[in-house]
Design a protein with these regions (language model features):
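A generic secondary-structure micro-motif detector
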Residues: 52, 114-115, 140, 172-174
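A conditional alpha-helix N-cap/helix-loop micro-motif detector
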Residues: 71, 140-144, 176-177
Length: 262
């Protein structure tokens, strides 16, 4: 279960001071996780039909409701998606449902969402996450072979695939955190651009039960990053990672009007 919001702030403050930006704030409940061993990354037959109806009648309507009525998401920069059929998409991880913020911002494009394997969970929420396009990583080699095949399959068929390069979710944390290289490895491996996104917050004027002000969202879609022909694979991974992170740092400073301090 999520920790109380004030407790979350204290944990974030502590981890920030220690420079441990990829640590999880909420405890991970492995008891509700389902093994990825039998996860179908590419849905077929009756499962594909089931997922279609779940996505059409539950996931999509809730995505619209959440973004229009609850967090009142504004999307900036959708013109950068023009002409980009397949891509790796990155975003800061700041909200339990920020994958739905990404879905809303990227509407009109098919989106798959990478996730830690413990997110493949039991119950209704797990069902909806799978219907919404979740692709869990795995600690097992054989499962990652299937994951990698699915990556290739979807990118060849005009899909976007979302990565959270910060790894852990920090609730309503406004600063960009250091990026891992996984997303950029796949962009270089499959020859697709990276579309950087960054979520910022605006005040709602509403106070929640913890005495904290609720936030409204702005999703910034930024200019795609392409690999450079003159660089080898390793160099391009690092170039794209650094470029993406710097773009998010610049967006933070532009939006909030203050220098980034970590």
């Amino acid at each position: 279960m999520p920790a109380p919001r004030l407790d979350v702030l204290e944990k974030i403050k502590l981890l920030e001071s220690k420079g441990e930006f990829d640590q999880h704030i909420n405890p991970i409940d492995y008891d509700i996780a389902i093994s990825v061993d039998n996860f179908n990354y590419i849905k077929k037959g009756l499962e594909r039909i089931k997922v279609f109806f779940q996505n059409t009648f539950i996931v999509k309507p809730y995505t619209l409701y959440l973004n229009k009525k609850i967090i009142k998401t504004k999307v900036l920069g959708r013109h950068y998606l023009n002409g980009i059929d397949s891509a790796i998409v990155t975003c800061n991880h700041v909200y339990i449902y920020d994958c739905l913020v990404a879905k809303y911002g990227l509407r009109g494009h098919r989106l798959k969402i990478t996730a830690a394997e413990f997110n493949n969970r039991k119950g209704f929420l797990g069902e909806m996450m799978r219907a919404g396009g979740m692709m869990p990583f795995s600690s097992k080699y054989e499962n990652m072979k299937r994951f990698n095949y699915a990556m290739k399959y979807y990118l060849e068929r005009k899909n976007y695939i979302l990565f959270y390069p910060e790894e852990a979710m920090w609730h309503m944390y406004d600063k960009p955190r250091p990026y891992k290289k996984g997303a950029f490895h796949y962009a270089v491996k499959f020859g697709v651009p990276v579309i950087p996104m960054f979520i910022t917050f605006r005040n709602s004027g509403k106070i929640n039960q913890d005495g904290m002000e609720e936030k409204y969202f702005i999703l910034h879609i930024m200019k795609p990053i392409f690999a450079k022909e003159e660089l080898d694979a390793k160099q391009n991974i690092e170039y794209m990672r650094q470029k993406n992170y710097q773009m998010c740092c610049d967006k933070y400073q532009e939006f909030y009007g203050k220098k980034l301090k970590i």
